[in-house]
Swiss-Prot record:
One of its GO terms (cellular component) is cell-cell junction. SMART domains: PH, SAM. Residues 615-646 form a coiled coil. It comes from Homo sapiens. This is Connector enhancer of kinase suppressor of ras 1. GO terms for molecular function: protein-macromolecule adaptor activity. Residues 553-571, 678-695 have a biased composition (Polar residues).
Amino acid sequence: MEPVETWTPGKVATWLRGLDDSLQDYPFEDWQLPGKNLLQLCPQSLEALAVRSLGHQELILGGVEQLQALSSRLQTENLQSLTEGLLGATHDFQSIVQGCLGDCAKTPIDVLCAAVELLHEADALLFWLSRYLFSHLNDFSACQEIRDLLEELSQVLHEDGPAAEKEGTVLRICSHVAGICHNILVCCPKELLEQKAVLEQVQLDSPLGLEIHTTSNCQHFVSQVDTQVPTDSRLQIQPGDEVVQINEQVVVREERDMVGWPRKNMVRELLREPAGLSLVLKKIPIPETPPQTPPQVLDSPHQRSPSLSLAPLSPRAPSEDVFAFDLSSNPSPGPSPAWTDSASLGPEPLPIPPEPPAILPAGVAGTPGLPESPDKSPVGRKKSKGLATRLSRRRVSCRELGRPDCDGWLLLRKAPGGFMGPRWRRRWFVLKGHTLYWYRQPQDEKAEGLINVSNYSLESGHDQKKKYVFQLTHDVYKPFIFAADTLTDLSMWVRHLITCISKYQSPGRAPPPREEDCYSETEAEDPDDEAGSHSASPSPAQAGSPLHGDTSPAATPTQRSPRTSFGSLTDSSEEALEGMVRGLRQGGVSLLGQPQPLTQEQWRSSFMRRNRDPQLNERVHRVRALQSTLKAKLQELQVLEEVLGDPELTGEKFRQWKEQNRELYSEGLGAWGVAQAEGSSHILTSDSTEQSPHSLPSDPEEHSHLCPLTSESSLRPPDL
């Protein structure tokens, strides 16, 4: 596109007429305004040209501003700058929201203005991610959740509700958006982050076969290129390209105001000269060189849709489950079988043959300390029955799982009957094949637990405080109860779980599976207990030790797995040493051979496993509560006995004791008053001020305004 400074007066007049239908009454041709003067327009110059309507002035000045910024944005705009802009707007919005929503009945104006700024930054990033490089060659579908999060944010700000709940929801949404931005900046290759857009001119004989989508902000994108478009031009036009100029008429819009050409004007210009069509497209070129750093996968901690990982859509072997960036020298890799309906530009690369899996000796558990090849599928390792312990099956990260069948945040309820009653924990769940994993965060290197869904049945659940509850039940082993945040999440999970169960469920005549084949989990009871000994991403050495929260049957003395025997761990010194330490701990002895009791966490988890009856657990909890109450009352009674049995008790000494035990003294007076009221209703006495001989001593100064002072001897206990 030629510089605006070189535009002729005729071209300037044509561009001004294309801005809006309301500007058609102005004599733009009579102005004889060259391109250089167009860029210098201001409100005073428009007043001199008889453009007095403020709305018309805004339309023209906004378009001029867009022309000025078009070339400058090409040099500065990229994925990194747009992501950092959204991240900064999110942090600014968080700082404004904190403490502001609780003071006003309605949402303050400054909060709404900050929300509008946040929406503008999000729109700019999402429009950038709609380009062909990001929407077809790399999977950034996880980032589309930003749109859903901001729609939820808009609803929350306009709804009436408790201020604390509204502020908590807003901050949660902002943290989700910030997490997605951080993952883009950290996990995306440098080539994609710094890739800038370019302007490219394309000549077409006819606009037939070209589908253009217009957004609500009058921004025009190519959505589809049919076979009617000539081959040479079809290779130059890609889905996601933005239409900047049609037949030398700029149709772009200003970044934040609707000053671009409306769709009907754009279509009219396309059809004005069908014999020859010239387009200038703003597009992101496909890099020719591969990335220099090892590729990584984008993990979104707030994704609700089944597609999460940031991965290329190049063909792969059926057993290949590890996705990564692959910007090969071929600028147009072919689509994967899952994306056969998308546009394919260029030859399709040959699929990579899968590598044969490594064969381990029978009975040897996977060593947590040994490095693993990144091209091995974790699902393939997991399917090697009898070769891996339950702990090693959970030593797999979201990144290693690759593209999941379904993932998202769910609430997991503890097994009923805990000491503090049932509680819910928010976890990130990933359904891959027939296995359901859950993590504290999507970045964790080890799953907290896993369930073989094919051995369970899906049923609806009930809870007084949760609305969208469902559960996986088993005829023999304990159930797992979940709760979704919304009805959409519930429908998504139920649909995928039903598909998984029907696909992988064993026939009815199959023998019942063992407990270790059904589930494996880390049963950490309290977050406070976990904070001292656990981390969000434990190292392999920590993950292999039962002292770090793994209370699965392979790590508890109440239920031992036959796979962790000393005879099977003699292939290497490291495995043998690990097996010996695990065996000593399972046997209840220390490294020196001395008896060692169970840890509190192991004892509590084994108690919950032995008592699965909720009624029995509630009775036990009731007994323990009564025992604690009895213990506290005995301590209070001992304190009272000490003060009543003191032979040197004086008024001053008693007042000091009362200050130190004010709560106990108040309870004693209250109990004494109740006893007096009950006694007076049955026994009528003439002296209503006479005190019971067993009552607590009272401070003489405290009741001096109610009755005459008595002698000091009457305030002493009977034995003084």
